[in-house]
Amino acid sequence: MARYFRRRKFCRFTAEGVSEIDYKDVVTLKNYITESGKIVPSRITGTCAKYQRQLARAIKRARYLSLLPYTDLHK
């Protein structure tokens, strides 16, 4: 009986000691959105609730200012 152990998820922002997530940091924000432009949930990324809220707010601001696309699937 082989048991599969998942690697424990951790909040990258807490580990790095980030005080606030910046909406201008597009490279970091792109890691937390899917190919279709949706925000990846914290149960997938392991981000804690405090930083997930900041992340969502930063992504929405970046979209509004056209730093990030709303979707990548424009035809």
Swiss-Prot record:
Superkingdom of source: Bacteria
GO molecular function: small ribosomal subunit rRNA binding; structural constituent of ribosome
UniProt entry keywords in alphabetical sequence: Ribonucleoprotein, Ribosomal protein, RNA-binding, rRNA-binding
Record Gene3D superfamilies: Ribosomal protein S18
Annotated GO biological process: translation
PROSITE patterns per UniProt: RIBOSOMAL_S18
InterPro entries xrefs: Ribosomal_bS18, Ribosomal_bS18_CS, Ribosomal_bS18_sf
GO CC entries: cytosolic small ribosomal subunit
Protein family per UniProt: Belongs to the bacterial ribosomal protein bS18 family.
Subunit structure: Part of the 30S ribosomal subunit. Forms a tight heterodimer with protein bS6.
This protein's name: Small ribosomal subunit protein bS18
